[in-house]
Design a protein with these regions (language model features):
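Expand to "…catalyze enediolate/carbanion chemistry for C-C bond making/breaking, isomerization
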Residues: 1-167
Length: 167
């Protein structure tokens, strides 16, 4: 509830919100060159469990529109990248179709499958692609190939400008 209230309170202000950190580190408990097979297995299990937790936290944050988070250990970077890339790539086909249809219909309300998009959704769809590009999940070319917008329109970052210039 508190996170949602914070998002509503700061929405549209330009303040970027960040979700909290995962404080379980992907660090093996046993060190040294002469580890037993059991210690090696425990090290692997401990690190994998921490990675899974961090990945799940990142995905939860992204699903709730927190696009920034804190990583406390370099060993968390692989799971951050995996979570961010997976988040954007899983939704890419649907977002591509929705943005393409919406722009081509000049901001008329559209229905794609069972998802209704209106003018307020256009900026969110554009932001989806901008964030996917910023994190490296897709390239500008891939975004352009999947939508009906131009490079200048994409880089403008403004759905209102896209529609205004197409009229």
């Amino acid at each position: 509830f508190a996170r949602n209230m914070m998002q509503v309170s700061f929405g549209g202000t330009g303040v970027w919100l960040s979700d909290g950190a995962t404080n379980i580190m992907p660090v093996a408990p046993h060190r040294g060159d002469d580890l037993t097979p059991e210690q090696i297995a425990e090290n692997r299990s401990t690190v994998h469990r921490a990675w899974k937790l961090h990945y799940d936290h990142c995905r939860h944050s992204l699903a709730n529109a927190f696009y920034q988070g804190w990583d406390l250990h370099p060993g968390q970077l692989p799971t951050r990248y995996a979570a961010v890339f997976t988040f954007f790539l899983e939704g890419l086909d649907a977002a591509s179709e929705r943005l393409k249809n919406f722009v081509e219909k000049a901001a008329q309300a559209t229905l794609v499958g069972d998802i209704f998009d209106d003018a307020a959704t256009g900026q969110g769809l554009l932001n989806y692609f901008l964030r996917a590009i910023n994190c490296g999940a897709v390239t500008e070319k891939e975004a352009l190939d999947r939508t009906s917008i131009t490079l200048d329109e994409l880089r403008s970052g403004s759905f209102v400008k896209i529609l205004k210039n197409r009229r």
